Curated annotation (Swiss-Prot):
Modification sites for Phosphothreonine: T730, T734, T736, T740
Ranges of compositional bias, category Pro residues: 637-650, 704-717, 726-741, 772-782
Gene3D superfamilies listed in its UniProt record: Arfaptin homology (AH) domain/BAR domain (1.20.1270.60), Rho GTPase activation protein (1.10.555.10)
Places the protein is found: Membrane; Cytoplasm; Cell junction, Tight junction
Protein name: Rho GTPase-activating protein 17
UniProt record, GO biological process: actin filament organization; calcium-ion regulated exocytosis; signal transduction
Limits of the BAR domain: 14-246
Disulfide bond sites: none
Subunit annotation: Component of a complex whose core is composed of ARHGAP17, AMOT, PALS1, PATJ and PARD3/PAR3. Interacts with NHERF1, FNBP1, TRIP10, CAPZA (CAPZA1, CAPZA2 or CAPZA3), CAPZB, CD2AP and SH3KBP1/CIN85.
Location of the region described as Disordered in the Swiss-Prot/TrEMBL record: 459-482, 519-807
GO MF, one annotated term: SH3 domain binding
UniProt membrane topology term: Peripheral membrane protein
Length: 846
């Protein structure tokens, strides 16, 4: 206690008083002492932050730490998900990635254990053991110095007072002297120990710095091992990715898409073309009318994932066309390439048509192989689409306007409107002639179903699956819109599986008197009696496929289960719409109340003999004809007006369109137009001279006034005889331009409408001609032939009233125009009855 009291007294004297303070440490040791606090603080914070960097639990073994790592939990989750997704691409990816994450977690746990053992524990020892020991010795030295100073102060005081008092002082002074020497020795010992520890600490500073080198080396080693795990997993995952072909096609370069999918034609192009070939070829405004945004987005997504379930898009061809345009526009490089942009625009400025076609051909050959094949495929389809321009209104010019900017655009930067404005004019001038002359630019036929992955619809004629008027079972596009007669024509031609055409649905539409007057011709001139020579064709005709089918099945009329007579028709009279005023010479009427009927089937060339089949049915057995019940309400037809402009359906005017799988532009007659007009005028004059006075219609209904405007004419096409010679084979680099080939091939057998015996019917204005279905009329009992070829009787009909059977008119006409009758006799089809329902136009009663 006395020693402690002396220390406090000495400390107070040094602090408050003027007592001398002894400093035993050198300047170097004092500097080392100041650095100890900084080093200790650094080691403490480093240890603390390293613990925060650990993902595992601190202070545990490697296995337990591995289970607690977040990466381990992630790896387990991925592996469980991969087991649920099985063999899908995502399942394989998750499995590989889960294994990699698990391996990374194992490497991380080993790395943390090493860092904790080799780095964190030594840093903790420096901060919490070595430096505190040195600081403890420094405090001990400070206490010893205070004791030494206190003893020395007391010794000095005793030595000063010894001059006045000599009794007892020598012993006290000696005691203080010994105590002072002892305290000095302790100070020296502690000072030496402290200095040694401080110097040792400074000597180990390089060793302490090595801990951080080890930390970085451990991290580098960990990352190397982790990188090895990743490098092992990445190629495997890339292999799975490359093997999986279902990748987005929109916005992907054409070459990459074709290489990845192993296709020749891009999937969106082929899929859209096949869908449009099924239901969109006769859709008006195709590629021009926009589709619904949601429908278009859905179709693009379906094409991106390469789905084969595209049946629902058959009903919306505009969405399909929009998807095709969108794919072409979203290509990083246009189908006609940026590199050839300057050449395309220069060719568009060429005025000479021949040179322009040559330059276009040369530029097409410069396209890359993938672009050339897809461009050829697309142009062939667009040319096929343009063949039905009379229905869909998409001419080559219209197609080039709406689709051209999606095939070629400039590479320079700018707004979409600026690029389109600068490019559209040139593109239209390039695309339009290529579509017009597609067969010359790309000779040969194109198989649109290249991948054979698209199957046509099971019932393509959805509008006509039932002829009873029930459309509830119809599918695809035609169910959503009215059954236009133009579409019916193309679809009915495709129904080759039916041997006959059912006409039950027409029986319900011919009930009213007004309908019969509007459907039937306004008058029927008396037919002259004809002999056998008039009925015989001028020359044998080669049998068609339909006539062979008729002759093989009996060659005569076929009775359906309803008792209605159905006639097999040849291709010549099944497809084209018949003129409204034509009269069949094969079924003239000789009497009104005949009990027998005779049909003359189509003549087939079989060994030069013509076969004729007669079917006789008693009137009582067949039942009364429904047409005889309406005989009393039929009014006499008015006399025909003077012939004016002949309607397009007239035999002397524009001929009917030909038969084909798709509607084609109508072709003119091979004979010159002037000769046809002269023949028409002569026939009309002869008709006015020899036709007796006709009875007029006395119906109570007001007469229908004829329009004052002339009837519209269909677009003209170059005649077959006016086509120039085909270009001969030329070198590929200098092609000879075609002589403007027509859009559709001419069919000589369909270039002229059949001219019938009798007089020319009354001309009347008709609306714009439309393609009508080539379906047979309701059954009419034909007249009976006598032995010499004349007609003896005929069952009267509700649409025509025959009042005369004089044959002098026909004979006089035959004598004046022998070449016309001989030509017509070779073209008329026996056994076929033409009705106004074929054209479905209004009658005009004056």
């Amino acid at each position: 206690m006395k020693k402690q009291f002396n220390r406090m007294k000495q400390l107070a004297n040094q602090t408050v008083g003027r007592a001398e303070k002894t400093e035993v440490l050198s300047e170097d040791l004092l500097q080392i002492e100041r650095r100890l606090d900084t080093v200790r603080s650094m080691c403490h914070h480093s240890h603390k932050r390293l613990i925060a960097c650990f993902q595992g639990q601190h202070g545990t073994d490697a296995e337990r730490r591995h289970k607690k790592l977040p990466l381990t939990a992630l790896a387990q989750n991925m592996q469980e998900a991969s087991a649920q997704l099985e063999e899908s691409l995502l399942g394989k990816m998750l499995e590989t990635c889960g294994d990699a994450e698990n391996q990374l977690a194992l490497e991380l746990s080993q790395h943390e254990v090493f860092v904790e053992k080799e780095i964190m524990d030594p840093l903790y020892g420096i901060a919490e053991v070595e430096i505190p020991n040195i600081q403890k010795q420094r405090k001990q030295l400070a206490r010893l110095v205070l004791d030494w100073d206190s003893v020395r102060a007391r010794w000095n005081q005793a030595h000063k007072s010894s001059g006045t008092n000599f009794q007892g002082l020598p012993s006290k002074i000696d005691t203080l002297k010994e105590e002072m020497d002892e305290a000095g020795n302790k100070v020296e010992q502690c000072k030496d120990q402290l200095a040694a520890d401080m110097y040792n600490f400074m000597a180990k500073e390089g060793e302490y710095g090595k801990f951080f080198v080890t930390l970085l080396e451990a991290q580098a080693d960990y990352h190397r091992k982790a990188l090895a795990v990743l490098e092992k997993a990445l190629p495997e995952m890339r292999a799975h990715q490359d093997k999986w072909a279902e990748k987005p096609a929109f916005g992907t370069p054409l070459e990459e898409h074709l290489k990845r999918s192993g296709r020749e034609i891009a999937l969106p192009i082929e899929a859209c073309v096949m869908l449009l070939l099924e239901t969109g070829m006769k859709e008006e405004g195709l590629f021009r009318i926009g589709a619904g945004a949601s429908k278009l987005k859905k179709l693009k997504a379906a094409l991106d994932c390469s789905t084969s379930h595209l049946d629902e898009f058959y009903s919306d061809p505009h969405a399909v066309a929009g998807a095709l345009k969108s794919y072409l526009r979203e290509l990083p490089e246009p189908l006609m390439t940026f590199s050839l942009y300057e050449e395309w625009t220069q060719v568009a400025s060429v005025q000479d048509q021949d040179k322009k076609l040559q330059y276009l051909w040369t530029t097409c050959q410069k396209l890359p192989p993938q672009n050339f094949v897809n461009f050829r495929y697309l142009i062939k389809f667009l040319a096929k689409l343009a063949q039905t321009s009379d229905v869909n209104k998409m001419t080559p010019s219209n197609i080039a306007i709406v689709l051209g900017p999606n095939l070629l655009w400039a590479k320079q930067e700018g707004t979409l409107a600026e690029i389109a404005a600068a490019t559209s004019v040139h593109v239209v001038a390039v695309i339009e002639p290529i579509i017009q002359h597609a067969d010359w630019f790309f000779p040969g036929e194109v198989e649109f179903n290249v991948s054979e992955a698209f199957v046509p619809l099971a019932t393509p004629n959805s509008n006509h699956s039932s002829h009873t008027g029930n459309d509830s079972d119809s599918g695809t596009l035609e169910r959503k819109r009215p059954a236009s007669m133009a579409v019916m024509e193309g679809d009915l031609v495709k129904k080759e599986s039916f041997g006959v055409k059912l006409m039950d649905f027409q029986a319900h539409r011919r009930g009213g008197t007004l309908n019969r007057k509007h459907i039937a011709p306004a008058f029927q001139p008396p037919l002259p009696p004809t002999d056998g020579n008039a009925l015989a064709p001028a020359g044998p005709e080669p049998p068609s496929q339909s006539s062979r089918a008729d002759s093989s099945s009996g060659g005569g009329p076929v009775f359906s289960s309803t008792g209605i007579l159905e006639q097999g028709l040849s291709p010549g009279d099944s497809s084209p719409p018949k003129p409204k005023d034509s009269v069949s010479a094969a079924v003239p009427a000789a009497g009104r109340n005949s009990n027998q009927m005779t049909t003359v089937p189509n003549q087939a060339q079989t060994g030069g003999n013509s076969h004729q089949l007669s079917v006789s049915t008693p009137h009582s057995a067949a039942g009364p004809s429904p047409h005889t019940l309406r005989r009393a309400v039929k009014k006499p037809a008015p006399a025909p007006p003077k012939p004016g402009n002949l309607p397009p359906g007239h035999p002397g005017g524009q001929s009917s369109p030909g038969t084909g799988t798709s509607p084609k532009p109508s072709a003119r007659s091979p004979s010159p137009p002037q000769q046809q007009q002269q023949q028409q005028q002569q026939q009309q004059q002869q008709q006015q001279q020899q036709t007796p006075g006709m009875r007029r219609c006395s119906s109570s209904l007001p007469p229908i006034q004829a329009p004052s405007h002339p009837p519209p004419q269909p677009p003209t096409q170059p005649r077959l005889g006016e086509q120039g010679p085909e270009p001969g084979p030329t070198p590929p680099q200098t092609p000879t331009p075609p002589s403007t080939p027509p859009l559709a091939k001419q069919n000589p057998s369909q270039s002229e409408t059949t001219q019938l015996h009798g007089t020319l019917p009354r001309p009347r204005p008709v609306p714009k001609p439309r393609n009508r279905p080539s379906v047979p009329p309701p059954p009419h009992p034909p007249g009976t032939h006598t032995v010499d070829g004349g007609l003896t009787s005929s069952v009267p009909t509700a649409s025509r009233i025959v009042t005369d059977t004089n044959s002098r008119v026909s004979e006089s006409l035959r004598s004046i125009f022998p070449e016309i009758h001989s030509d017509l006799a070779s073209k008329e089809v026996p056994g076929h009855i033409l009705l106004d329902i074929d054209n479905d136009t209004e009658s005009t009663a004056l």
